[in-house]
Amino acid sequence: MKYVGSKNRLSKELVPIIQSYITKETKGYLEPFVGGANMIDKIKHHNKIGCDIHKQLIALLKYVQNLDNELPKTISEEEYNNVKKNKDEYEDWYVGLVGFCATFGAKYFGGYARGFKEDKITMRDIPSESIRNIEKQRKNLQNIKFMCGNFLDLPKELIKNYVIYQK
């Protein structure tokens, strides 16, 4: 998923380093600031936890995990503005989808995303591109436990012998 501060472009270098710390004794892998899940989705371990305090982000990631749940093909500027002004009237996952996928620069509700293709004439459908990125990531999110909250509130005994990656 496109996300401000994403480490996706660095994952080819970082994942092997992180993976090298995961041994047979490792009980799990934790990302306390999971963001767009662009690192955790590439780590190999049977017990992965992605934590974040952003309620709509975690709701979106959980929604996307369910392969039966459908996502819209795109998000219009009118829909973006309606959701931005009336967040309480929509489900959290949908607010997260609109806030991240239809926003310029993946900055949560930082302005509707617009852009042009390389010909500088044809408009791009950036929300549609972002939603397709999430669809591609979907299968890699299946075995991750997403939790909304401050990772400091996790019981220390729960995360003992975990590899923890903090961005």
Segments (PLM) and residue ranges:
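S-adenosyl-L-methionine
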Residues: M1-Y29, F33-V34, N38-I43, G96
